Amino acid sequence: MQFPESWLRTFVDPQLTTDELSHALTMAGLEVESLRPAAPPTEKIVVGRVLEVVKHPDADKLNVCQVDAGTGATLQIVCGAPNVAPGIKVPVALVGAKLPPAEEGGAPFAIKLSKLRGVESQGMLCSARELKLSEDHSGLMILPEGTPVGQDIREALNLDDTVFEIKLTPNKADCLSVFGIARETAAITGAPLAAPDIRPVLAELTETLPVKISAPDLCGRFSGRVIRGVNARAKTPHWMVERLERAGQRSVSALVDISNYVMFELGRPSHVFDLDKIHGGIDVRWGKRGESLKLLNGNTIELDETVGVISDGAQVESLAGIMGGDSTAVTLDTTNIYLEAAFWWPDSIRGRARKYNFSTDAAHRFERGVDYSTTVEHVERITQLILDICGGQAGPVDDQIVSLPQRAPVSMRASRANRIIGVEIGEDEIAQIFTRLGLAFERDGDVFRVTPPPHRFDIEIEEDLIEEVARIYGFEKIPARPPVAKSEMRATDETRRSVHAIRHALAARDYAETVNFSFVDAEWERDFAGNDNPVRLLNPIASQLSVMRTTLFGSLVGVLRHNLNRRAERVRVFEAGRVFVADPSVKAGELAVEGYAQPKRIGALAYGPVVEEQWGTATRQVDYFDVKGDLEALLAPVPARFVKAEHPALHPGRSARIEVDGHAVGWIGELHPRLMQKYELPHAPVMFEIDTDALVARALPAPSEVSKFPPVRRDIAVVVDQKVEVQALFDEMKKALADDACKFVQRVALFDEFRAKSNTSGGLSAHEKSLAFRVTLQDAAGTLQDETVDQAIQTLVDRMARVYGARLRG
């Protein structure tokens, strides 16, 4: 937001210097990025009147001018500007004057007594560009007729004015105007605010333009009026051009300048249509697929049902709240106009300009929220300026209200405000702050019930009001105190470990931590979670980050692709983050949003060689069992079951559901071949995702006696049907450990699998497989006898034979 200080002080004039005012605004949250003079330093440049103009005797493009510069003697100045004429008033650089340098950092341009083609020139007539006031170099800068001859140009044009540039946060849409800044300045400093004097314009016509609002979710209020007989060629007043240019807006034409001026003055974007180019009435509606519109910037865009438009009986005329169309644009030949000012719902404008790769001042304001109570008032203001400058006759204001925001009161507890701000602010002082801010409130004890005004779209919760109290009270008045807390030793819960410890454990297993956005592409949710109805964001920062994730798999694959694109060959990453799942059973709370569960999960991905390449070890790609081993180490000493199951993101034959104590806690497996092909991955990564709670919980360590006697190891090979899962056999052997005969069994591990290549290979049928297990037994009290070991092995085999038809391989 850029504006001249002189414009601001027409609304509020605190007894502060420019620097003090800048500091006050910054400390109240309106950061002043820069202060710069309206014009560079100049010397001996005054207002002069051209008395006579004659052709140069020796140059076709030069004129010899007689100029009254208030010096007491007429000056002869040679000038080549095409618009020089007797009677005009222009800036005159006297001999000895210093003009701003032509290039930044250069030396000032000194004016000397000189001869041009043999004719003496006693100075120079200046253009706006030569004074560094604008880029206009089409001719001399012509000053208003009432400007005193001989007056210093800095005084005549207020060139010692200061231009403020303020960096506004997105919530401060109410400050996107000079009056909005003035309103804040009055609240901050206590200086009186002079509101603009806007009076209704007398309607000399009865004509109105038929308006239909077909989309109340697009436009809540639409105000407009017909004005006939305007002179579009009228010259914009110098004072308006000056303010616009110092606000960063170049002058275009009187009608356009007036619309822009009121936008900068009051914060209300408006649009002026050429009435004679409108076919019938206008309809405010959503666009339709297949429609197109040529905009004022010359671009032709394709419309759809997500963007709002203003159309007439023949075609679309404007991109609602963003930019007008070329077909109804005003020109210098326009004589009849339709003036429009509306309230557009912020959600209906937000992101639409970015969709077409451009931005406008109107969209910037409307997508943040513009006062919906002042559309008629602003139409009256624009109308009066048009009639004053361009003439014409106005019709009545047609004001249609279909749906406006319902502003519910927001409660703030004074006690909580004091606790958060860290300083005691009295309730009466809080009441004064709200009054200065123009916030209507009711008091009930220490509770303030504030009704947000129509121009404040940023006040929704208690913390918003606390922020208002803090910044108007003054951040500088809040003492800097070090935090004070009790220093006490708390007992450590040995049945739980921190997520920080889990992250360290993964890092120790050669996984690098990554942090990703919780919002992802909707396509990722379909691919990696099979979710066609994700939690959608109301205001995504980008179209590819429009939904909340329900799995970490997509984020991890995204990191993998990023690294592969940079020639990484081995990638092992993990993330500890939240996912967001719709769950009607979740109630609202301090850290909960009603209807949405936000569990924290740990996800990891391994890709490429198992270990870095080295001369003593053969290179092989990481597989399911490598990552399964990492996960088992992470869960230890808690045993986990890996049950064959299918997940949308994982290979149907190489994936499993992770279960702990009979509860599903996560997934593990290779990436689905379909996704591997879609995301152009040379090899399949292996991934797992598990609830953090399953990793955090752990049993108390129980010391056990270390046996003095050696363990006994026996290998058994059993033949089972190929459909029998190894996990099922492990489950049965685990049940057998409850038998007294198996009390010395310490561990059972699979070390080999064999499948027949033909019907008679290895004594196996085509539908059978051989599984080899290594059983470790140990007794802490003595050496195990062969009879005891044989009995334990036989018990395990009998159990598998009874349930799954297993037999010992001969």
UniProtKB/Swiss-Prot annotation:
Subcellular location: Cytoplasm
UniProt xrefs under CDD domains: PheRS_beta_core (cd00769), tRNA_bind_bactPheRS (cd02796)
Entry EC no(s): 6.1.1.20
GO molecular function, a single term: phenylalanine-tRNA ligase activity
InterPro entries listed in its UniProt record: aa-tRNA-synth_II/BPL/LPL (IPR045864), B3/B4_tRNA-bd (IPR005146), DNA-bd_dom_put_sf (IPR009061), Fdx_antiC-bd (IPR005121), Fdx_antiC-bd_sf (IPR036690), NA-bd_OB-fold (IPR012340), Phe-tRNA-ligase_IIc_bsu (IPR045060), Phe-tRNA-ligase_IIc_bsu_bact (IPR004532)
Entry keyword set: Aminoacyl-tRNA synthetase, ATP-binding, Cytoplasm, Ligase, Magnesium, Metal-binding, Nucleotide-binding, Protein biosynthesis, RNA-binding, tRNA-binding
Signal peptide (residue range): none
UniProt keyword rRNA-binding, yes or no: no
Cofactor: Mg(2+)
SMART domains: B3_4 (SM00873), B5 (SM00874), FDX-ACB (SM00896)
GO cellular component: phenylalanine-tRNA ligase complex
Keyword Aminoacyl-tRNA synthetase assigned: yes
Record's protein name: Phenylalanine--tRNA ligase beta subunit
Annotated catalysed reactions: tRNA(Phe) + L-phenylalanine + ATP = L-phenylalanyl-tRNA(Phe) + AMP + diphosphate + H(+)
The protein's enzyme class: ligase
A Pfam family assignment: B3_4
Source organism per UniProt: Burkholderia mallei (strain ATCC 23344)
Quaternary structure, from the entry: Tetramer of two alpha and two beta subunits.
Domain tRNA-binding: residue ranges: 39-154
Primary site of residence: cytoplasm
